[in-house]
Amino acid sequence: EFRSFTSMYKMCYGCTALTHVRQLETDNVTDMMWVFYGCSSLQKIDGLITSGIKSASEMFHGCTSLHTISHSLDFSNVESQIDTTFTTCRILQNVRFSGTINVDIYMNGCPKLTVDSLLSLLNALADGVTDKTCKIGSTNLAKLTEEQKAIATDKGWTLE
C-alpha cells in the first residue's frame, strides 16, 4: 500500500525480476518518474491509480515485456510531456486512457497497440489544443481509418 506516498520516484527502477503488478493504492502519488524503468520482465499491470500524478517521465521506459496495463491510465494532471513514458514498450498491446491528455504524448515505440487501445488514446486527447503532438508511429497509423485519425486532428493535435 502506497496511500501515504507522494512520490514513487525510481521505486521499482531496474527490478528485472518483477513480472506482474497487482492493485497499487497510489491515490496521493504525484511523482511516478522512472517508477518501472528497466523492469524488462514486467508483463502486466493490474490496477495503477494515476489520476494525481504530475510527472510520468520514463515511467515504463525499458519495460520490453509489458503487454497489458489493465486499469485505465489517467494523465489529466501530468504537466510535462509524456514523450519517454512508453519508450521501448515494443510489445505493449492493451492500454486504456481516461481523463484528458493535455501534453505531447509519444507512443511510437509501441507498434503492437490494438485499435481499441489507439482509439482510447485518441479519445483522451484534449480538445482545442495548439502545437501538441501525438506520436503513434507509422505501424499504428496504418491500423486507423481516416475518420479515426480525425478524432485527434479535429481537436488540433498533430498525429504522427
How does the language model describe each region?
Residues 1-160:
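Negatively charged
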